[in-house]
Design a protein with these regions (language model features):
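Helix-to-loop junction immediately C-terminal to a conserved catalytic motif
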Residues: 47
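Catalytic Walker B motif of ABC-type/P-loop ATPase nucleotide-binding domains
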Residues: 158-162
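The feature captures the beta-strand-to-loop junction immediately N-terminal to the Walker
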Residues: 32-34
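Conserved ABC ATPase signature
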Residues: 133-141
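Q-loop/switch helix immediately C-terminal to the Walker
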Residues: 80, 87, 92-112
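ABC ATPase NBD Q-loop/coupling interface
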Residues: 56-76
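Hydrophobic anchor residue at the start of the ABC signature
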Residues: 147
Length: 213
């Protein structure tokens, strides 16, 4: 996958160039690199939320066939390959309203779902917090709730943008444990976290190159 800093400018310099990797079920690929190299952008490109200059993403489906976003359709791709932002967008209403909205989407109606309230309860999120308005929640509460909602949708791949950045150490470890069997691409700046969760690491460099270890 290749992405220019400004896709509207033909000869704009590259943000990252020809990044190539595969990810097996149950693996966690940690994405590292200094600020501004495109870590969040590459997750958004994989999620088909941000355009890219060249490349293709493929997902091994239940039918054991590799499918592109075009093959599956963008709504299906985003349901299977789900992006979780570092700072969840503050929406109108409560987290429960958000869950109801997601469950109303046609693409979600025939999928298995888990109870996000039950998932988040293990992380210290009590049921009453789901009824509060988003701005009334702390950053850590918002982060845990957004992640619980994503897990409840049971995507094949989670794209995680610093999912524990607003959490205390104990909550961080609980979230890591809940994600231990999941297939993830995970941005972190925490060396200790990388050592705990990663199967492999992708480092993006300021010159648009990358290393995979």
């Amino acid at each position: 996958m290749t992405r220019r800093r400004d896709e509207a400018v033909k000869d704009s310099e590259y943000l990252f160039y020809n990044v190539n990797f595969d990810l097996h079920e149950g693996e966690v690929l940690v994405v590292r690199g200094p600020s501004g190299v495109g870590k969040t952008t590459i997750l958004r490109c994989i999620a088909q939320l941000t355009p890219y200059s060249a490349g293709v993403c493929l997902l091994n489906t239940d039918a054991k066939e590799f499918k592109s976003p075009t093959d599956l359709g963008i709504p299906q791709w985003r349901a299977d390959v789900m992006y979780v932002s570092q700072r969840p967008a503050l929406m109108a209403g409560s987290p429960l309203d958000f869950v109801d909205m997601i469950n109303s989407f046609a693409i979600q109606k025939n999928r298995d779902h888990y109870d996000p309230v039950e998932i988040a309860e293990d992380w210290g999120i009590t049921a009453d917090l789901w009824e509060k308005k988003w701005p009334e929640l702390s950053g850590g509460e918002q982060q845990r709730i957004a992640l619980a909602v994503a897990l409840s949708c049971d995507p094949k791949v989670l794209l995680l943008d610093e999912p524990t950045s607003a959490l205390d150490p104990q909550s961080t470890l609980m979230v890591e444990d809940a994600l231990s069997s999941r297939t993830c691409i995970w941005i972190t700046h925490d060396d200790a976290q990388e050592s705990r969760v990663s199967s492999r690491s992708l480092t993006i460099h300021p010159d648009a190159s990358y290393t995979l270890t």
